């Protein structure tokens, strides 16, 4: 609990309270000896604790992030602003970004998840874009204990509660259950927006004397030190830190969004910059806006709208109260901006101005309470080159491939369809409004969500993907696969992958083996992005995802957006008609290490990860996209967790269509998780043209049927089950587990 009476500079030094706020002894010493050359007061120490946190400064991850490929002729705005922007032609652009809210969701799951959604929405409309879609990538422990069930229910309710109320459809995402996330769930939210390129905004504060205007909700004591909390290792003691979790109001956010977009579209001649007050609150938005412009800033904290009495400068600057934005407006145009926000019933107050020089000055009750170099806050945090050591777990890996023996292929399929990660998530995403705004073409449950772009023939395909198990067994190859699977989902939906955003969820970077996971997987992601021409344009780093010293699997969530140039090319994963030919594109090997089958049969994952070839992956994706654009494909579904047989079953379920298939593969290989594969259905009329284009890379399996039967004859056994019964198992598993 913070003292009401401010600590003196010597009190701060002697009590070492800065440690509680996230600064190390070395960082405090750097601040006093080099940056300020004096002892900082309580407020100044607080400012640096927030801005030098990993969440704001990327001090542990910046050397890693430099490895990412961020180029491409389609990139209009890369990393560095509130969100990235990619050209989609016709003077339009897509804006997207993902953010993590892991630690807050662990201690206060409803508000943690809800405010994660709210924050990422603000990042999108701060760029001038109207948000059109949300996605969520969730990781929980096994859904068997009461606390995990509580987390799941509250996180899902928080996401739906915020997104539904503000009127933005949730059209995709992914949910995985694994003991690795038992104490440290991951809640990653992604938002996508559309804008005309003429409306692009930036977070900057330029022009000496121009006004700095605070808009939106009043400031309270919620979320103070939230950036530092999000940057710290999680343990049981942290579960009491609910005051570090923000409280959201989606109805306020809706008003704020509409008001800000009105200012951007109708008052652009006086608007200089706009930025969300996110992590580290007012200090982050104001210092970053000034630093990017090479300006100084002077703020009067007495003018900050407050919902609680007696707030200190420390609290006012570091509060992470939600639904707040900061604008820089031409001097003399303040009243013009006030009128817009008054119309929506929102506070709009000039709290400061842009100044000459490079100082960041705060005044409170007529006194100067902070006077520091603005760049020291925003861009001069120490950057650490962490030690990297190959993890012991990789040195002790078995070189042998896990080879399952299936006594009962159909029985194994029944069990597979009921695994929490494989089973239908409709009971979760069914609570989200996926069709508000009436632009959703493909709802959650297919490979990617698809949303049309109004007044055009275009659509966007969006997805989130990563398999942490693969990265646990091989961080670099697992990073490549994460990007590849996201691209597969876009291509299977008829889209051309454009770019990615990421949430890099890892353990403690000060542990050499944990830093190895981060660094190696980043190299894999970078290589795949360059090959697929999908630059990283935005993202977020969430480190110290450890509970009592136990780290999660390395989990770099990849959010990808693709462009479908013609809506006729939109493709879904479900079989459409009886009598269609069914193919698998790509070869199937005995790849079981890290697979869902290995976990299901042995309770763990182990061994060296199977081989993966990005060139083969890229070729297969290009072949499929060409076939789709030529009108040769009725359905396409990427093969991922659970293998080929699970993919086939999932394609049967939506239309209750059966299949009669045959293969010379052994039954076990139908559960292998070899990459670079798709299950494709083709009408008889297109079969010859399809085979002419795709041979020798496709294998004919058989045909869809009008029967209620999934029958696959393999080299040694047959899968034989009613589609309706298999679907019942698949749909009922998760609701049963979560009771």
From Swiss-Prot:
Catalyzed chemical reaction(s): N(2)-formyl-N(1)-(5-phospho-beta-D-ribosyl)glycinamide + L-glutamine + ATP + H2O = 2-formamido-N(1)-(5-O-phospho-beta-D-ribosyl)acetamidine + L-glutamate + ADP + phosphate + H(+)
A GO biological process held by the record: 'de novo' IMP biosynthetic process
Active site: 55, 101
GO MF assignments: ATP binding; magnesium ion binding; phosphoribosylformylglycinamidine synthase activity
InterPro entries: PRibForGlyAmidine_synth_PurL, PurL_linker, PurM-like_C_dom, PurM-like_C_sf, PurM-like_N, PurM-like_N_sf
EC numbers, comma separated: 6.3.5.3
Gene3D superfamilies, sorted: PurM-like C-terminal domain, PurM-like, N-terminal domain
Keywords: ATP-binding, Cytoplasm, Ligase, Magnesium, Metal-binding, Nucleotide-binding, Purine biosynthesis
Keyword Metal-binding: yes
Binding site for Mg(2+) 2: 123, 276
Functional pathway: Purine metabolism; IMP biosynthesis via de novo pathway; 5-amino-1-(5-phospho-D-ribosyl)imidazole from N(2)-formyl-N(1)-(5-phospho-D-ribosyl)glycinamide: step 1/2
Compartments, as annotated in UniProt: Cytoplasm
Description of how the protein assembles with itself and partners: Monomer. Part of the FGAM synthase complex composed of 1 PurL, 1 PurQ and 2 PurS subunits.
Family that this chain belongs to: Belongs to the FGAMS family.
Name under which the protein is recorded: Phosphoribosylformylglycinamidine synthase subunit PurL
């Amino acid at each position: 609990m913070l003292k009401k009476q401010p600590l003196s500079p010597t009190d701060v030094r002697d009590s070492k309270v800065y440690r509680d706020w996230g600064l190390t002894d070395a960082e405090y010493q750097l601040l006093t000896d080099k940056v300020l050359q004096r002892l900082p007061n309580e407020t100044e120490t607080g400012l640096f604790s927030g801005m030098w946190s990993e969440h704001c400064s990327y001090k542990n991850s910046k050397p890693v992030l430099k490895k990412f490929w961020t180029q491409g002729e389609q990139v209009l705005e890369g990393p560095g602003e509130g969100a990235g922007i990619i050209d989609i032609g016709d003077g339009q652009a897509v804006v997207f970004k993902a953010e993590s809210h892991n630690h807050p969701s662990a201690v206060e799951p409803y508000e943690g998840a809800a405010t994660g959604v709210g924050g990422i929405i603000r990042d999108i409309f701060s760029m001038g874009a109207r948000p059109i879609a949300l996605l969520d990538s969730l990781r929980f422990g096994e859904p068997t204990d009461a606390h995990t069930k509580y987390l799941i229910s509250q996180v899902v309710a928080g996401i739906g509660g915020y997104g539904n109320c503000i009127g933005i459809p949730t059209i995709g995402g992914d949910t995985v259950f694994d003991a690795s996330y038992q104490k440290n769930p991951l809640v990653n939210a992604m938002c996508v927006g559309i804008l005309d390129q003429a409306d692009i905004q930036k977070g900057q504060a330029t022009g000496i004397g121009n006004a700095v205007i605070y808009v939106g909700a009043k400031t309270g004591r919620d979320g103070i030190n939230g950036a530092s909390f999000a940057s710290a290792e999680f343990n049981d003691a942290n579960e009491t830190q609910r005051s570090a979790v923000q409280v959201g109001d989606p109805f306020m956010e809706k008003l704020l969004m509409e008001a800000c977009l009105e200012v951007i579209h109708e008052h652009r001649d006086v608007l200089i910059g706009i930025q969300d007050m996110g992590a580290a609150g007012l200090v982050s938005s104001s210092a970053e806006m000034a630093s990017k412009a090479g300006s100084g800033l002077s703020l009067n904290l007495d003018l900050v709208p407050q919902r609680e009495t007696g707030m200190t400068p420390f609290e006012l600057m570091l509060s992470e109260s939600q639904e707040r934005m900061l604008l820089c407006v031409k001097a003399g145009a303040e009243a013009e901006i006030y009128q817009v926000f008054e119309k929506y019933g929102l506070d709009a107050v000039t709290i400061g101005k842009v100044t000459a020089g490079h100082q960041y000055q705060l005044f409170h009750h007529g006194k100067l309470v902070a006077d520091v170099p603005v760049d020291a806050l925003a861009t001069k945090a120490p950057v650490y080159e962490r030690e990297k050591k190959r993890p012991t777990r990789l040195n002790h890996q078995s070189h042998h491939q896990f080879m399952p023996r299936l006594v009962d292929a159909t029985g194994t399929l029944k069990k597979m369809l009921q695994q929490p990660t494989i089973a239908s998530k409709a009971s979760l995403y069914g609570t989200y409004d996926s069709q508000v705004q009436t632009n959703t073409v493909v709802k959650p449950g297919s490979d990617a969500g698809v949303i049309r772009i109004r007044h055009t023939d275009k659509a966007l395909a969006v997805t989130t993907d990563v398999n942490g198990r693969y990265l646990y067994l091989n961080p670099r190859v697992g990073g490549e696969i994460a990007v590849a699977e996201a691209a597969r989902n876009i291509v299977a939906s008829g889209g051309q992958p454009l770019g990615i955003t990421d949430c890099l969820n890892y353990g403690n970077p000060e542990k050499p083996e944990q830093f190895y996971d981060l660094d190696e997987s980043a190299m894999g992601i970078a290589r795949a992005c360059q090959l697929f021409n999908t630059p990283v344009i935005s993202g977020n780093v969430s480190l110290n995802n450890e509970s009592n010293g136990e780290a999660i699997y390395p989990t770099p969530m990849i959010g990808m957006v693709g462009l479908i140039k013609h809506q006729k090319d939109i493709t879904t994963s479900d079989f459409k008609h009886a009598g269609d030919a069914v193919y698998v594109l790509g070869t199937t090997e005995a790849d079981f290490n890290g697979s869902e089958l290995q976990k299901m049969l042995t309770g763990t994952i182990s061994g060296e990860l199977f081989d993966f070839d990005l060139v083969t992956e890229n070729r297969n994706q290009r072949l499929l996209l060409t076939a789709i654009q030529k009108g040769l494909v009725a359905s396409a579904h990427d093969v991922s967790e659970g293998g080929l047989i699970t993919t086939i079953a999932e394609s049967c379920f939506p239309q209750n269509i059966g299949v009669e298939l045959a293969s010379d593969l052994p039954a076990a290989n139908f559960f292998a998780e070899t990459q670079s594969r798709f299950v494709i259905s083709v009408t008889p009329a297109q079969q010859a043209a399809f085979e002419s284009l795709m041979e020798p890379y496709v294998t004919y399996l058989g045909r869809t049927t009008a029967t209620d039967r999934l029958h696959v004859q393999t080299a040694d056994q047959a899968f034989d089950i009613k589609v309706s019964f298999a679907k019942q198992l698949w749909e009922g598993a998760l609701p049963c587990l979560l009771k």
